[in-house]
A protein has these predicted regions:
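Disordered inhibitory propeptide/activation segment of secreted metzincin zinc metalloprotease zymogens
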Residues: 1-29, 57, 97-116
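Aromatic-enriched hydrophobic runs in primary sequence
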Residues: 9-14, 52, 60, 150, ...
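Metalloprotease/metallohydrolase-associated module, dominated by Zn2+-dependent proteases
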Residues: 18-22, 31-48, 110-150, 162-210
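Generic ordered-secondary-structure signal
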Residues: 2-3, 8-9, 55-62, 82-88, ...
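Metzincin-family zinc-dependent endopeptidase catalytic domain
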Residues: 40-159
Length: 210
């Protein structure tokens, strides 16, 4: 296990468009690992959308770099999110090199001996092949916006597994087993009521620990 992963584990402790509801929040650290050439615009849109989704679930997302963990913060919940590949679509013509297969994975979270680990990965090549054809005619800034928002929804799904410590899914919303293209690109896509109740209870349980 690398030094920065060990450092991130040391941060964990047991101490105490349409608007989304504002709730008391439990701090959730999301450490993002991306290629050096990652375009910042889709990433910023992803952060904005992800913060809103998790806020409604009772979590306040704090972003960081896994190579420079904040050892003084003492976050209650922590996720390392790796962005694999080129996460975005540059301005200009878009050519679909290979169609995405039905049921292809957009992301995954590590599981060890049945235990959900706080390490998730987004497969941006598969995401691009999924939504790229619908964004081909959009201007560069709009592509960044829609792409970043789609990334956030995929990330929120994986973070659900990490925060709940479970591989289970809901029947609807962000925590359901698979997404449609509409889920990724529609104006609004959130956790359903059942998933929200579970997440809010989890956040409250963490916040109440002595």
């Amino acid at each position: 296990m690398s030094a920065w992963v060990l450092a991130l584990f040391s941060l964990l402790h047991t101490a105490p468009s349409l608007s989304r509801p504002v709730l008391p929040h439990t701090a959730l650290a999301v450490y993002i690992s991306a290629d050096a050439g990652q375009s910042p615009a889709p990433l910023e849109y992803m952060k904005r959308e992800l913060s809103g989704i998790m806020q409604s679930a009772g979590y306040r997302v704090v972003y960081g770099d896994p190579r420079k963990p904040d050892t003084a913060a003492g976050f209650s919940k922590l996720v390392v999110l790796e962005l694999r590949g080129n996460c975005g679509m540059p301005p200009g013509n878009y050519r679909l090199e290979r169609a995405v297969a039905s049921g292809v994975s957009l992301a995954e979270t590590s599981v060890s001996s049945g235990v959900v680990m706080p390490f998730s990965r987004i497969n941006c090549a598969n995401l691009t092949r999924t939504i790229g054809p619908l964004l081909a005619d959009e201007a560069g800034a709009q592509r960044d916006y829609f792409y970043g928002r789609a990334m956030a929804r995929v990330a929120a799904h994986e973070i659900y597994h990490v925060t709940m410590g479970s591989q289970d899914h809901s029947h609807e919303g962000v925590a359901k087993p698979s997404f449609t293209v509409a889920d990724l690109l529609d104006e609004r896509f959130d956790f359903d009521r059942v998933a929200l109740a579970h997440l809010r209870q989890s956040a409250a349980d963490v916040a109440s620990r002595p």
